Swiss-Prot record:
Domain spans labelled KH: 19-78
Organism ancestry: Eukaryota, Metazoa, Chordata, Craniata, Vertebrata
Gene that encodes the chain: Khdc1a
Protein name: KH homology domain-containing protein 1A
Entry's localization field: Cytoplasm
Keywords: Apoptosis, Cytoplasm, RNA-binding
A Pfam family per the record: MOEP19
Protein source organism: Mus musculus (Mouse)
Length: 166
């Protein structure tokens, strides 16, 4: 991850294609990013991502969250947010520990290693070059990804994070 900071990950156009976009409840947003987005800049710097928050984006008052940056970092941020909001106590604890970690120091390469979680699912669909993420509360990873490249749709189905080769 330090190489990304030295070289300037924001100079790599591919990191801005297909951003991760999802909606978040206001109370979870305040918990993760702090009141008045106090921790937002720290989270961005420590995760090598750019995070945009659009408050009251949906009629129910949810915040639209857009994350760009290296894929592993985006997935790490999304996993942390998912775990913080989980109904499962163990996942909540893991998510809160991840949140404290990212507030305290930058992610390391070993933090970005993907570890398979049994019984988990994530659904990602692509529309207008934007990746929308829907994570039903009862599903958590195998991963299905569809990206649109120059008019062609490429679908990548991953049944387990162990199948994902970087």
């Amino acid at each position: 991850m330090s190489d990304l900071r030295r070289k300037g990950w924001w100079n790599v156009p591919d990191y801005f294609h297909s951003p991760l976009v999802f909606d978040m409840e206001e109370d979870k947003e305040d918990y993760i990013f702090g009141p008045h987005d106090e921790y937002l800049h720290t989270l961005e710097v420590h995760s090598n991502t750019l995070i945009q928050l659009e408050r009251w984006f949906t009629p129910t008052g949810q915040t639209r969250v857009t994350v760009v940056g290296p894929l592993k970092a985006r997935l790490w941020v999304m996993d942390m947010i998912r775990k913080v909001g989980s109904k499962n106590n163990l996942d909540q604890i893991k998510g809160k520990m991840m949140l404290l970690q990212i507030r305290d120091h930058p992610l390391r390469d070993r933090d970005l290693e993907l570890h398979p979680e049994s019984g988990s699912s994530l659904w990602i669909t692509t529309m207008n070059d934007t990746t929308f993420v829907e994570v039903p509360h009862f599903l958590r990873f195998p991963l299905t990804v569809a990206w649109l490249f120059c008019g062609f749709v490429r679908i990548l189905g991953i049944h387990n994070f162990a199948d994902l080769h970087w």
